Amino acid sequence: MAEKTKAFELRTKNKTQLLEHLKELRTELSSLRVAQVKSPNPSKLAKIGTVRKAIARVLTVFNQTQKNHLRAVYSKKSSSKIPTDLRYKKTRAIRRRLTNKQSKVVTLRVSKTATNFPQRVFAVKA
């Protein structure tokens, strides 16, 4: 079971299959740890690393698929209703920045001045 599992192969599996595979890998890891204590065989030690990485790979695929499904569920809702871990990341400064609509808002006085005194266009004599 310790052969290297590929992430693209794991993505084809459904949730129950992934959890079964994870359970198998964890039991194998525990048996390898017991074998490590009983007899320090170098081949078993190397196998522990591959099994641990396989477990990490399965968990990564599982969490990514789960997050994608949740994003699809929340896609129709407004941004304030989406859980924070599903929102876009960007940077803190960008998230706090004014939106385009907010930055284009002009006071009444400025808008009246702009309409009453438009910018002049000059023709250049050649």
Swiss-Prot record:
PANTHER family: 60S RIBOSOMAL PROTEIN L35, LARGE RIBOSOMAL SUBUNIT PROTEIN UL29-RELATED. The keyword Ribosomal protein applies. It comes from Dictyostelium discoideum. One of its GO terms (cellular component) is cytosolic large ribosomal subunit. This is Large ribosomal subunit protein uL29. Keywords: Ribonucleoprotein, Ribosomal protein. SUPFAM superfamilies: Ribosomal protein L29 (L29p). Belongs to the universal ribosomal protein uL29 family. The gene is rpl35. GO terms for molecular function: mRNA binding; structural constituent of ribosome. InterPro entries: Ribosomal_uL29 (IPR001854), Ribosomal_uL29_CS (IPR018254), Ribosomal_uL29_euk (IPR045059), Ribosomal_uL29_sf (IPR036049). One of its GO terms (biological process) is translation. HAMAP family: Ribosomal_uL29.
